[in-house]
Amino acid sequence: MEFKVLAVGDVVGNPGLERVRRHLRQLKRKTGADFVVVNGENAAVVGITPNQAEDILDAGADVITMGNHTWGKREIVDYMEDCPQIIRPANYAPQVPGRGWQVFETKAGDVAVIDLIGRCNMDYGPDNPFLLIEKILKQITAKIILVEIHAEATSEKLAMGYLLDGRVSAVWGTHTHVPTADARILPKGTGYVTDLGMTGPRDSILGIRPDLSIAKFRGDLTERYRWAEGPTKMEAVLFTIDSATGKCIKTERVDEWD
């Protein structure tokens, strides 16, 4: 049977949350998605609160993934320990709270979701994701395996895609907030896209007010980032997977802009 996975780009600020609240279920119905993964690490611009996580789950997400802003809101720590539907990068140090991967029961059987963070131009010095993923895969028996890599470098994301080609169902990138036009199936049957994009203000610089971002580039370090207002967008990719083989049989961008 076909199993459709909707992967939604980073939710940015209140505009992104409002877009999710109003439109995620509609997009889920429109695409026929069976399983929805949303990156939520920028829901509070830097981090996510428990209430924001609940809003995203209530809107139709099955899993929330995180990234380099996982710990932006300290109140998420206890919530993350108690809620298996929110996962942080698996290659953070073993003692940090939360979980880096999780297996979920679905109509197509078990589905594993793994969250990784890249190391090129990223903070915190995480463990090597290319080595850790091998250890994780040895623990997973699910036929359908989904991997998100939250990374800056396109080459690092592509390398992860090719490393896992034929071994997992889909690999997608997040973090840059800019959607890439390379959604495809790799030679051995893994669905891939370098970056999903973002969910939030349409007329913005990565979700932030353009004037504030420009001020930073001009050298004004006193301005604080604030999300832009106005029309919004939701950028996402739909992966259609053969549940019998775990292979991806179709990839499709399903971006929606106001």
PLM regions and their residue ranges:
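Acidic, metal/ion-coordinating pockets
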Residues: 1-258
